[in-house]
Amino acid sequence: RLEQYRIDAEGNAPIFFWQQDGDYLRSHVELSYTIDTRDAQIFPRKGGKFEVLAGYSGLGGDVHTYNFGVNGSYYWNLRGDTIFSINAGAATVDSYGNHDVPIFERLYLGGPYNMRGFRFRDVAPYNPALSGDETMGGRSSFFCQFEYSIPVIEEVRVAVFYDIGFVNGDAFDF
């Protein structure tokens, strides 16, 4: 995959963004393996999905990184069509050579898919001296979600959930 990125820091943008201002060409190749035993892709009631992936950027272009990730989820259909599920994921990204991991390659958590209750991309390291209250992204992340859902009427469910997770600044820092 070949992608073009532009970071255009303006006005009172944190210094961290100014340091990465410019155009980037990213060439990326990724290999993944997935096992999916869920009974449905949308609103599964039983089974699981497990995925491992590895990626490499730097076959030309300006971005020189590699990444690894693992994600898994499992669903149990209990009495009365209630469902208990666990969803978890871990990832890491690092650079090679004399390059840094650009902000668009860094890891973040937050939002409806991994850390509900937090704003999108709000869970990540930040350095007040460099970026004020803006997150700078990290190089290692982990999250785990527990959810129990109860049917209200057909196709409508109410859920109770508990999400945990973290993002660290260093690669392979779990």
Describe each model-derived feature in a short phrase.
Residues 3-155, 160-172:
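C-terminal outer-membrane beta-barrel translocator/porin domains of Gram-negative envelope proteins
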